[in-house]
């Protein structure tokens, strides 16, 4: 899967396509990475173009199995700062960090394809170091999990504990949610 953000804009609508692994440098994923975006740095450049469009409506199409949670949080916050109405649409396997970006939509504007699956899980990292360094990583993972569960709870209006339990299922690997389950949890508003 390519990783990029494409912008298709008109006076009344801006469409953004987010594809690929979030937070992995494009040069590591593709032979010709110039027009592809998977990192917040590249997204920020694109966001400058979006801000100049001043479109009253922005549609973000997400086709990603996730990636780096830090980049996803930064992209989420950048989208939330836009002045127009933001709609997020999830396709295929929308997983992990990609679900954080999906939560950036305006109220009532989070959508999912009828054939998609939506994965929420505890955060993961690869690490090495001594006992103190590893203990610090464990604490960071716990804080990250709490932050992500809090984001899902804030956007859905449901208790944070409900998301902590779902994310911790299967030894922290979480659960793939059907569109109906994602709508039932208010992570998504509309299944198409």
PLM regions: where:
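N-terminal organellar transit peptides
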Residues: 1-97, 104-192
